[in-house]
Amino acid sequence: MTTVAADLLPPNAGVLNAGLLGGDERRQRLAMFGLSVPALVLVALVLLVPFSWLAWLSFFDASGALSGENYARLLRPAYVNSFLSTLQVSAAVTAICILLGYPVAYLLSQLPQRVAQVLLVFIILPFWTSVLVRTYAWLVLLQREGVINTWLKQLGLISESLPLVNNLTGTIIGMVHVMLPFLILPLYSSMRAIDPVYLRAAANCGASPAQSFRQVFLPLSAPGLGAGAALTFVLCLGFYLTPALLGGGRVAMWSTQIADAVSKFANWGAASALSVALLVVTGIILWAMKWAVRRLGSSLGEG
Amino acid sequence: MSLKRLAIANLLGAATALLMASSAMAAGETLTISGFGGNLQKDLRATLWQPAADAAGVTLSEETQDGLASVRVQVQSGSPTWDIVHLGADECAVGGKEGLFEPLDYKVIKTDGFDKKAYGDHWIATNTYSVVLAWRTDVYKDKHPTSWKDFWDVKAFPGRRALSTYPQEMMEIALLGAGVSKDKLYPLDTKLSLEKLKEIKPDISVWWSSGAQSAQLLKDKEVDMMAIWGSRVASVIKDGAPVEFTYDNGILGYGCLAILKGSTHVAAAQKFIAGVVSPEIQARIPEMMPYYGPTNSLAFKVGKFSPEVLAKSNMSPENVAKQTFIDANWWRDNNELVREDYSLLISN
């Protein structure tokens, strides 16, 4: 606020009361910092302290001696494969969410606000239902004697039940369902913020609807898409419940390995190392995505 | 007015007396026992723990444990709030090796009637469960599978199968499927076992990870035959699903009790455990917890059971002869290595 005010004043006015303005700014900064202290303390207590403890644990083996054993273990094929399949599943779910979610968010953003708000309820509705319930519902729908297979058989479209669940297919269907709102909501709000004037201007300049979408709308919605995709991808990386229930034990997600290390093998050191690895990789991916989205946004804007 | 005051004074006096009486009873000693929770813990308390606590003159307080890790945290704290823990036998064996438990006093606890594999220096099995072969009778109408060899015979018995994500019992089952005789299982030939599992893997539709899930798979006909806990398949049959199972070639596993190191009630805990494994209290299992079994075979000498109860109990002399006991000590020493190979095999 003060800087804006300073900009509005004549150039020499700033010099006259610079000391006063500076003091004002410092006081305001202090006040802002003071206001955020409770939040900082909370984050430190519930996030940083436990995580530091977790990271600390990961350097000790089961007998309590200092060792890199827990990290060396991560290079074994079982863990490497699990890590790769976690990335694959997360990427697939994110891609499907984008394909399904982008048109929906686009449609919502083009509708009158009141209609869009009603339709948004349908997207938010699943949020109010427990993930466990939704996952079991998929089990009922997708299993061999489930609703979908029974219908398809009665319609004579298939003679043998399709393997829709207890495998990768079922896992991805279930995860997409849970993740879709996380993609659509940030995307929708960023699309709403795009001023329709830009698109009209593009049309006035002779751009076809496809051109104005590609050259104007898409780059402007890229930050929202990036945020939604990053959120979806990162949530997928740590997803436990749905893969565990719909994967039939055949989709080895990283989170399953962490749960196993704690619950089946009581090895907190190993579980900690797995968690630290997941966190580091998540951080790297988030950073890379942020960078990529910025590049994408600017290159599309130029092209 | 004074009459009313008198009445109140009387009431207070009676209440105080009552309070004192109940605190005097509790003063005996309170043992805190931590188990798996849920129905199993409820049944165990009613069947085994409460009568044993009454006999030992202690009050019982219950908690739930979350695997050996939670026990480790309790012991490492120096003053555990649990005295006794109910775990799976391999967890007891691992905990014993790690020094988490007090040694059991076998002068107090009598092991007559116990299989040698069913107790160790620091733990004793208190109830058994069976992992059995179960199948859908609507799928296998004329000829049903009768052994793990049939489970591996996908030509004679086509159909979708399920095994557990836990290597325990499954490694044994694979060896039985390979034709290894049940008295020659241990030490497990892990190489052969994993080979057999790899061979059957394309026909395993689901690797289940919880008892509830395993029951649902069979009930909803998601799979046609599977390895499943006896107690779970029993509930599926009770629900009217066309399912049968056999104790033939079943694997017997244990739940066990151990005393946490640092407990301040060790002597009372020893007495309590002695009660739990006594033939008289063990004899309550066949009727109160069908499909589970007593670990003390003398229970069948002490108790009189109807043929129906005996047919259901996994430990009745007739049924126990068909099955084989898990070796908790082998799993204690090999768990982690086998587990990694096993999960590698499942997920690749």
Regions found by a protein language model. Give the residues of each.
Chain B
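Periplasmic-binding protein-like
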Residues: Y129-V131, K191-I200, I237-S263, K304-E308
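A ligand-binding cleft/hinge motif common to bilobed small-molecule-binding domains
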Residues: D90-G96, K219, D224-P242
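Conserved C-terminal helix/tail region of periplasmic/extracytoplasmic solute-binding proteins
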Residues: E318-N348
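Extracytoplasmic ligand-binding site segments that recognize negatively charged/polar headgroups
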Residues: F36-R45, P80-W82, H86-K219
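Ligand-binding "clamshell"
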Residues: G95-P103, D115-D121, S235-Y247, E308-A311
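Early extracytoplasmic/lumenal segment of secretory-pathway proteins
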Residues: A27-V94
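Mature extracytoplasmic/periplasmic domains
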Residues: L260-V320
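A bilobed periplasmic-binding-protein/Venus flytrap-type ligand-binding module shared by bacterial periplasmic
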Residues: V132-V139, L175-V180, Y254-V266, I273, ...
